[in-house]
Amino acid sequence: MKKYLLLTFSLIFISCNTEVKTENLESDFSSFFKNGDIMTSATQDPLGNVFSYPTGEASITSQVKVWEPGFKSPWHYHPYTGVAYVVQGELTVNYDTETALDATGDEKTIVLSETYKAGDKAFLGVANTWHLSENKGSEDLIFIVSWLGEKDKPLAVLSE
């Protein structure tokens, strides 16, 4: 429901602001937008793995995720990396760096946890490592992720 309200208010805001000025454009919007890089020349994910582009036909999928407090994903892994940015709240990612990818039915164990907060720099999602993600905070978590995948290939593989 909150996603739909956010989308509705965004559309109302956009439709009410259809007039475009070309003079002093930067100063007109300086109170709304701050310029700055959220990721620059990233070559490694948070675990130190060097990322590479897919070998097949490249395909980018961008998603906005809104998770309520207490939400926890199932164990899964992504065959590809993605650029992620937390807009609101904090995202905790729990990694199992020891279980093989073909062990889909095996029990997973948290070996390492990383927490990313709103306002932090963007980060590369870890590819080919079992993990579960959660919102341990007291407010909705909103984050954006753009997956650098392959056409017609899954973005995630779930544990059984």
Language model: regions and residue ranges:
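Conserved short histidine dyad/triad with adjacent acidic residue
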Residues: 61-78, 82-83, 115-117, 126-127
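Sec-dependent N-terminal signal peptides
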Residues: 4-14
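Ligand-binding loop in jelly-roll beta-barrel domains
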Residues: 100, 117-120, 126-154
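Extracellular/periplasmic catalytic domains that process cell-envelope and extracellular macromolecules
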Residues: 55, 77, 85, 108, ...
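A short, N-terminal "cap"/entry segment at the start of jelly-roll beta-barrel domains
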Residues: 16-64, 94, 104-106, 113-115, ...
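Glycine- and acidic-residue-biased ligand/ion/polar-headgroup-sensing regions
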Residues: 80-109
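Active-site-proximal beta-strand/loop segments in catalytic clefts of secreted hydrolases
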Residues: 67, 78, 89, 96, ...
